[in-house]
Structures are given as C-alpha cells and as structure tokens.
Amino acid sequence: LLLSTCVALLLQPPLGALGASLEPEYPGDNATPEQMAQYAAELRRYINMLTRPRYGKRDKEGTLDFLECGSPHSAVPR
C-alpha cells in the first residue's frame, strides 16, 4: 500500500499541467514583436489569475465583530 502510494505521487503531472499557471518565461531581448506580444498576453493572464478575487472567504475582523455583537454574554451599553 505504501509503495503504491509513493508510485502514484511520483507519477503525478507537474502543477502546470493541473491548471496552476506557471509564470511565463521571458523570450529575451532579441525576441520578435510577435514573441513579445505572446509573452505580454501570457503575462497578463498569469497576473490576472494571481490577483483574482477570492469569493467566499471572510475576513477575520468582520467575523469577530459579528460574533461579539450576537453573544448573549456581551455587555449591554446603558
């Protein structure tokens, strides 16, 4: 069982093949305009993927405020 697990982990494709984008490689200073345009497009997609908003995650401050306000043990202002 352990041996088969190790073999399965070793045979997995690299992260880039699983959908996780790898940073595009700079084509060099002597690249053609077409190569630079392709690099710019790939870099833009890569940056957009890294900076996309993460929906469904709460910030800790907002969650803590909500929990404190709804607590029956919180002090009532007079």
Swiss-Prot record:
The gene is PPY. One of its GO terms (biological process) is neuropeptide signaling pathway. The keyword Secreted applies. Its main location: secreted. Pfam families: Hormone_3. Residues 1-19 form the signal peptide. InterPro entries: Pancreatic_hormone-like, Pancreatic_hormone-like_CS. Belongs to the NPY family. This is Pancreatic polypeptide prohormone. Gene3D superfamilies: 6.10.250.900. It comes from Ovis aries (Sheep). It is found in: Secreted. One of its GO terms (molecular function) is neuropeptide hormone activity. Keywords: Amidation, Cleavage on pair of basic residues, Hormone, Secreted, Signal.
